[in-house]
Design a protein with these regions (language model features):
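Substrate-binding N-lobe of the ribokinase-like
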Residues: 3-10, 40, 44-112
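Short, flexible, mixed-charge acidic loops at enzyme active sites
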Residues: 32-41, 117
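Conserved phosphate-binding/catalytic loop of the ribokinase/pfkB sugar-kinase fold
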Residues: 100-108, 115-150
């Protein structure tokens, strides 16, 4: 099948695809501001935040892109039992993503990447995440979700 015929086939049948996306579910937050002075406490710029934007990141961004193509998307991953998870759930629901595979962990926080931007330039990124392997109960819950999805 040539690239052109493959593309045409996908365009015609993509709405019928059911796709499970499993991976690191992240909340990406952008703090847009302006810098007009240096802090008196330390020689660092003071960013006066004017706007905050939150978007789906990591595997959740992949799921959002597939949902935009009108695929039926099922999201699997591990998040914390926190407010950022609730933000992710609301954003996924708005995009029609089935997030029943999000495992709520009491042992970790939802991965969040915060970017501080001033004068159209990224000044700093803060990462909130547990970088170790999944805990056995998280892996088991995710596997069970996937098995049920495939039945």
């Amino acid at each position: 099948m040539t690239n052109l015929s493959c593309t045409a086939f996908l365009a015609e049948h993509i709405q019928n695809l059911k796709i499970a996306v499993i991976g690191d579910v992240m909340l990406d937050r952008y703090f847009y501001g302006e810098v007009k002075r240096i802090s008196p406490e330390a020689p660092v710029p003071v960013n006066k935040v004017k706007r905050i934007k939150s978007v789906l990141g990591g595997a959740a961004n992949v799921a959002a892109n597939l949902a935009h193509l009108e695929c039926r998307v099922f999201m699997g991953g591990v998040t914390g039992a926190d407010n950022n998870r609730e933000v992710l759930e609301a954003m996924m629901a708005e995009k029609g993503i089935d997030y029943s595979g999000l495992i709520k962990s009491q042992q970790r926080e939802t991965i969040t990447k915060m970017r501080i931007l001033g004068a159209q330039q990224q000044m700093l990124r803060l990462d909130f995440e547990e970088t170790g392997d999944l805990f056995p109960e998280e892996t088991e819950a995710l596997s069970l979700w996937l098995q049920n999805l495939l039945e």
